[in-house]
A protein has these predicted regions:
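Trp- and S/T/G-rich repeat-edge/linker motifs of beta-rich repeat architectures
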Residues: 5-19, 73, 77-79, 128, ...
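Conserved core positions of repeat-based scaffolds
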Residues: 31-34, 43, 91-94, 103, ...
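Asp/Glu-rich intrinsically disordered low-complexity tracts
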Residues: 37-38, 56, 62, 66-69, ...
C-alpha cells in the first residue's frame, strides 16, 4: 500500500501519474486510493476482495513497474468522474460527479449497498457501466460518503444520513443491530434515515471501524455505534 515491498519509517513519495496530480487520498486496511485532479481514481495495495477496482484480485504497488502511469485508472462508467473517495478495510466507494455513489470490493455484510453479499471489482466486466449506482432512494443524491470497516454511510442532498452494511454494534444508527444492504428490498426508499434529532441535518460524515459520527449543520457532532 506504500507502493513498495519495503517498510518505511519516514515518508516517501508515491508515484501515481506523470500527467495528473492527486487532490485527495484515502487509506483502507491493506490498500490506498487517490483521487486525481481530472476526477479519475487510482488504487494500489492488497486486493483480495477486489477493493482496488480493477476486475481482478492482483495486488498492485508491491513490484517494480506497477505504479505511476502503469497503474490503471478505476473504471467508473461512461464519462463519470469522482469528486470524493472513501476506503475501508475491504471495500472502496466513490462519490461521482452526478451525486451518485458506486462501491466495490468485499461485501460480506452488504456494505457495498447492492442488496446481496457478492463482491464487486474482483472479476472481469464488473466495473465501469456494469457497476450499478447505490440506490439511495427516489430523487436522492449524496454530498458526502464514509466507509467504515464493514459499513458505509452517505449524507444525502437533503442533509439526511443513510447507512448500510454491518450493524452488530449499532454503527448504522437505526436503534437496532440488524445488518442492511445484504438482502433484497433493503436499499432505496426502504433504507431509513438516521434519526439525528428534530431540525438537525448533517453536512459531513465519518465512519470508524465500528462507529459513525456526523457533523451537523449547527456545528455539533453526533456519534453512534460501539463505545
Amino acid at each position: 500500500q506504500m507502493s513498495s515491498q519495503s517498510t518505511f519509517q519516514t515518508p516517501k513519495i508515491v508515484r501515481i501519474s506523470t500527467s495528473q496530480k492527486a487532490v485527495s487520498v484515502t487509506c483502507g486496511g491493506p490498500h490506498a486510493c487517490a483521487l486525481l485532479d481530472n476526477g479519475s481514481v487510482k488504487c494500489w495495495g492488497g486486493n483480495n476482495d477486489g477493493q482496488l477496482g480493477y476486475g481482478d484480485t492482483i495486488q498492485r504497488g508491491d513490484d517494480a513497474g506497477e505504479m505511476d502511469d502503469a497503474l490503471p485508472i478505476v473504471e467508473l462508467g461512461n464519462e463519470r468522474t469522482a469528486v470524493s473517495i472513501a476506503a475501508s478495510e475491504y471495500h472502496t466507494c466513490a462519490l461521482l460527479d452526478n451525486g451518485f455513489v458506486k462501491c466495490w470490493g468485499g461485501n460480506n455484510f452488504g456494505q457495498l449497498g447492492y442488496e446481496d453479499k457478492n463482491n464487486r471489482g474482483d472479476g472481469v466486466e464488473e466495473m465501469g457501466d456494469a457497476l450499478l449506482f447505490v440506490d439511495l432512494g427516489t430523487g436522492h443524491t449524496a454530498v458526502s460518503i464514509a466507509a467504515g470497516s464493514l459499513h458505509t454511510c452517505a449524507v444525502l442532498d437533503n442533509g439526511f444520513v443513510k447507512c448500510w452494511g454491518r450493524n452488530t454494534w449499532g454503527g448504522l444508527g437505526y436503534g437496532d443491530t440488524i445488518h442492511r444492504g445484504d438482502g433484497a428490498g433493503e436499499m432505496g426508499d426502504a433504507l431509513p434515515f438516521v434519526d439525528l434529532g428534530t431540525g438537525h441535518e448533517a453536512v459531513s460524515i465519518a465512519a470508524g471501524d465500528l462507529h459513525t459520527c456526523a457533523l451537523l449543520d449547527d456545528g455539533f457532532v453526533k456519534c453512534w455505534g460501539l463505545n
